[in-house]
């Protein structure tokens, strides 16, 4: 499944590394990345390919927990749903 991972929060060392590490542990391929720092806040979007055998509900929970641990908001959305939300 193609999906979009968004990461928002105060910039700090290690955010990208920790998010990328979780993706690698789950064998999730990063297709594209865009990130910027705005007024000290990280705004990152990743297009990823999630293997079909992974449970997206469990994965969403893991990203939520990681976000809490590192002090950012991490959202995972199916790319089709993300596109529909932004093409109204």
Regions found by a protein language model. Give the residues of each.
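A conserved regulatory-domain signal marking ACT and ACT-like small-molecule sensing domains
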Residues: 1-88
């Amino acid at each position: 499944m193609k999906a979009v991972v968004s990461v928002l929060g105060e910039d700090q060392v290690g955010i990208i590394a920790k998010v990328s590490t979780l993706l690698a542990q789950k064998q999730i391929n990063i297709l594209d990345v865009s990130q910027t720092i705005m007024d000290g806040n990280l705004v990152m979007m990743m297009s990823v390919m999630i293997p079909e055998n992974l449970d997206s509900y469990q994965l969403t929970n893991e990203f939520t927990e990681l976000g809490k641990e590192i002090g950012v908001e991490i959202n995972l959305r199916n790319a089709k749903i993300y596109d529909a939300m932004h093409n109204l």
